[in-house]
């Protein structure tokens, strides 16, 4: 009998010299877009490793390059096809190299990917990421490109093997898809209507992660407040309070120190969630809730189904229950038809809300969205000028809020890849419980990514805190042990979005 190892070659039983095993094929996954894609890319990596591939070392040329793409921004197409063009000479020089394109842009463009980049081997969509190893093998065997785009979710990505980027923080998907119809967003047409995982499955995954040493989880959904209305299991009844119950259940998991979630929709944000946030020991005092615009007229045009005063009322109640909460948001500048009066309304809400940080975007026209057909598309120069004014205002507010923390002690979950200048400044970096980025002087070599320290804030900037007072307390963790042992520890955000700008972070995206 002869057994075949798909990645390592053929070995035989019986007489004769042993057959030399061929080296495993290497892979690289390049991720663009939102935190959903980061989660899915960890599954793509897990699938490939389960199939016998191994991660390519930094700086090496991988045998398989996978692009997990985003379709939210206008430049997503140019970015993908530009990167594919850069790989074309490598593909010509090495026909055995394989290139795969997945994610939202692949779901949207489908066969057009091969028309624009005929050297691509595999195109797969958002609903069938589990097919990637099979498609790669089929393309290699048949010498023909494979395009497989499913119209509905075949399997929850969270049920697939995972190769996580971090030993200390993990993404946990609670739902896939979105039932909203924001006019600027293409995501619902690409990821489908919302489907929710069962609470039992989610909590089982969280417990498994904690058993592996994970300290922090981020619950992911396009609209986490809608969780419970579209369970995949028909035996589970609709439950409008399911998300608050899920947060409280996370509080009962021993060893789980931090719980974050992203993103809620203001139209469905309810007081039971605020109560659960305030009363559950490990839910972090942080809320990322997209506003998009402070103008009620623009919110109607966006089909956001809430108005500015409702939004401000929610954050007022959050701050009443959790006074130290850091509240962050998403804002779009230059939506079609936005007047100076509309923009002034956004500035007014930003002043009143006092966000700790804001992810601010210039409106990007996306074919296939209702907003792309609206009159009043604004000149680039007008959008840019408003964008710069908004950034200046928010940075002033962020700096004032961060300066108020100087002299205070802060607990930090130490991270890797969060500090662009850590090597030069001899600092380490991590996230406070409220999501703020903290650069601190360790003063001792024993502190490791995954450990938990406390330190005192000595300086503030709009996007980060500096703590040069030294480490006040240091707790070694199993996550730190795993990082030291060489388990995955690549750059990863501790929950997204956070307050501050790491070197490389997923962009908030999708319909929220």
Swiss-Prot record:
<dbReference type="InterPro" id="IPR013848">
    <property type="entry name" value="Methylthiotransferase_N"/>
</dbReference>
<feature type="domain" description="TRAM">
    <location>
        <begin position="403"/>
        <end position="471"/>
    </location>
</feature>
<feature type="binding site">
    <location>
        <position position="185"/>
    </location>
    <ligand>
        <name>[4Fe-4S] cluster 2</name>
    </ligand>
</feature>
<dbReference type="InterPro" id="IPR002792">
    <property type="entry name" value="TRAM_dom"/>
</dbReference>
<keyword id="KW-0963">Cytoplasm</keyword>
<feature type="binding site">
    <location>
        <position position="182"/>
    </location>
    <ligand>
        <name>[4Fe-4S] cluster 2</name>
    </ligand>
</feature>
<keyword id="KW-0004">4Fe-4S</keyword>
<keyword id="KW-0949">S-adenosyl-L-methionine</keyword>
<dbReference type="GO" id="GO:0046872">
    <property type="term" value="F:metal ion binding"/>
</dbReference>
<feature type="binding site">
    <location>
        <position position="70"/>
    </location>
    <ligand>
        <name>[4Fe-4S] cluster 1</name>
    </ligand>
</feature>
<feature type="binding site">
    <location>
        <position position="104"/>
    </location>
    <ligand>
        <name>[4Fe-4S] cluster 1</name>
    </ligand>
</feature>
<feature type="domain" description="Radical SAM core">
    <location>
        <begin position="164"/>
        <end position="400"/>
    </location>
</feature>
<dbReference type="InterPro" id="IPR005839">
    <property type="entry name" value="Methylthiotransferase"/>
</dbReference>
<dbReference type="InterPro" id="IPR023404">
    <property type="entry name" value="rSAM_horseshoe"/>
</dbReference>
<dbReference type="InterPro" id="IPR020612">
    <property type="entry name" value="Methylthiotransferase_CS"/>
</dbReference>
<keyword id="KW-0808">Transferase</keyword>
<dbReference type="InterPro" id="IPR006638">
    <property type="entry name" value="Elp3/MiaA/NifB-like_rSAM"/>
</dbReference>
<comment type="similarity">
    <text>Belongs to the methylthiotransferase family. MiaB subfamily.</text>
</comment>
<dbReference type="Pfam" id="PF00919">
    <property type="entry name" value="UPF0004"/>
</dbReference>
<keyword id="KW-0819">tRNA processing</keyword>
<feature type="region of interest" description="Disordered">
    <location>
        <begin position="1"/>
        <end position="22"/>
    </location>
</feature>
<comment type="function">
    <text>Catalyzes the methylthiolation of N6-(dimethylallyl)adenosine (i(6)A), leading to the formation of 2-methylthio-N6-(dimethylallyl)adenosine (ms(2)i(6)A) at position 37 in tRNAs that read codons beginning with uridine.</text>
</comment>
<keyword id="KW-0411">Iron-sulfur</keyword>
<dbReference type="InterPro" id="IPR038135">
    <property type="entry name" value="Methylthiotransferase_N_sf"/>
</dbReference>
<keyword id="KW-0479">Metal-binding</keyword>
<dbReference type="Pfam" id="PF04055">
    <property type="entry name" value="Radical_SAM"/>
</dbReference>
<feature type="binding site">
    <location>
        <position position="34"/>
    </location>
    <ligand>
        <name>[4Fe-4S] cluster 1</name>
    </ligand>
</feature>
<dbReference type="GO" id="GO:0005829">
    <property type="term" value="C:cytosol"/>
</dbReference>
<feature type="domain" description="MTTase N-terminal">
    <location>
        <begin position="25"/>
        <end position="141"/>
    </location>
</feature>
<dbReference type="InterPro" id="IPR006463">
    <property type="entry name" value="MiaB_methiolase"/>
</dbReference>
<comment type="subunit">
    <text>Monomer.</text>
</comment>
<dbReference type="InterPro" id="IPR007197">
    <property type="entry name" value="rSAM"/>
</dbReference>
<feature type="binding site">
    <location>
        <position position="178"/>
    </location>
    <ligand>
        <name>[4Fe-4S] cluster 2</name>
    </ligand>
</feature>
<protein>
    <recommendedName>
        <fullName>tRNA-2-methylthio-N(6)-dimethylallyladenosine synthase</fullName>
        <ecNumber>2.8.4.3</ecNumber>
    </recommendedName>
</protein>
<keyword id="KW-0408">Iron</keyword>
<dbReference type="GO" id="GO:0035597">
    <property type="term" value="F:N6-isopentenyladenosine methylthiotransferase activity"/>
</dbReference>
<dbReference type="GO" id="GO:0051539">
    <property type="term" value="F:4 iron, 4 sulfur cluster binding"/>
</dbReference>
């Amino acid at each position: 009998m002869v057994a075949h190892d798909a990645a390592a070659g053929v070995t035989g039983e019986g007489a004769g010299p042993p057959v030399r095993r061929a080296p495993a094929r290497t892979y690289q996954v390049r991720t663009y877009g939102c935190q959903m894609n980061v989660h899915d890319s960890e599954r793509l990596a897990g699938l490939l490793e389960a199939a016998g591939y191994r991660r390519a070392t930094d700086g090496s040329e991988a045998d398989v390059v996978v692009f997990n793409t985003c379709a939210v921004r206008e430049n997503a197409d140019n970015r993908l096809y530009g990167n594919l063009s850069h790989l074309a000479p490598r593909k010509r020089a090495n026909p055995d190299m394989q290139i795969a394109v997945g994610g939202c842009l692949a779901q949207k463009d489908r066969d057009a990917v091969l028309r624009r980049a005929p050297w691509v081997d595999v195109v797969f969509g958002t609903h069938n990421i589990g097919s990637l190893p099979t498609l790669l093998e089929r393309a290699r065997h048949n010498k023909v490109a494979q395009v497989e785009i499913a119209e509905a979710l075949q399997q929850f990505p969270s049920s697939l093997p995972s190769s996580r980027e971090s030993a200390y923080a993990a993404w946990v998907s609670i739902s896939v898809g979105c039932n909203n119809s924001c006019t600027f967003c293409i995501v619902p047409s690409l990821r489908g209507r919302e489907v929710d995982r069962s609470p039992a499955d989610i909590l089982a995954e969280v417990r498994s992660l904690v058993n592996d040493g994970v300290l922090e989880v981020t619950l992911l959904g396009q609209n986490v407040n809608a969780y419970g209305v579209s369970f995949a299991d028909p035996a589970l009844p609709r439950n409008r309070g399911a998300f608050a119950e899920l947060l409280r259940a996370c509080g009962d998991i021993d060893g789980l120190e931090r719980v974050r979630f992203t993103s809620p929709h203001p139209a469905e944000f309810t007081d039971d969630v605020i109560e659960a946030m305030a009363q559950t020991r490990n839910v972090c005092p942080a809320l990322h809730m997209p506003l998009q615009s402070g103008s009620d007229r623009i919110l109607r045009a966006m089909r956001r189904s809430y108005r500015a005063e409702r939004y401000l009322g929610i954050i007022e109640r959050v701050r009443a229950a959790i006074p130290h909460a850091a509240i962050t948001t998403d804002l779009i500048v230059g939506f079609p038809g936005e007047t100076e009066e509309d923009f002034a309304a956004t500035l007014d809400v930003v002043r009143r809300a006092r966000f700790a940080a804001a992810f601010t975007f210039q409106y990007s026209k996306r074919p296939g969205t209702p907003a792309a057909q609206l009159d009043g598309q604004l000149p680039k120069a007008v959008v840019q000028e408003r964008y710069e004014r908004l950034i200046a205002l928010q940075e002033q507010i962020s700096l004032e809020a961060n300066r108020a923390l100087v002299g205070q002690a802060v607990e930090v979950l130490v991270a890797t890849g969060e500090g662009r200048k850590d090597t030069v400044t001899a600092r380490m970096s991590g996230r406070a419980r409220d999501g703020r980025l903290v650069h601190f002087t360790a003063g001792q070599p024993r502190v490791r990514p995954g450990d938990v320290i406390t330190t005192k804030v000595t300086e503030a900037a709009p996007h980060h805190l500096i703590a040069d007072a030294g480490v006040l307390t240091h707790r070694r963790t199993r996550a730190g042990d795993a990082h030291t042992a060489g388990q995955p520890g690549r750059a990863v955000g501790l929950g997204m979005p956070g307050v501050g700008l790491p070197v490389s972070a997923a962009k908030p995206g999708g319909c929220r």
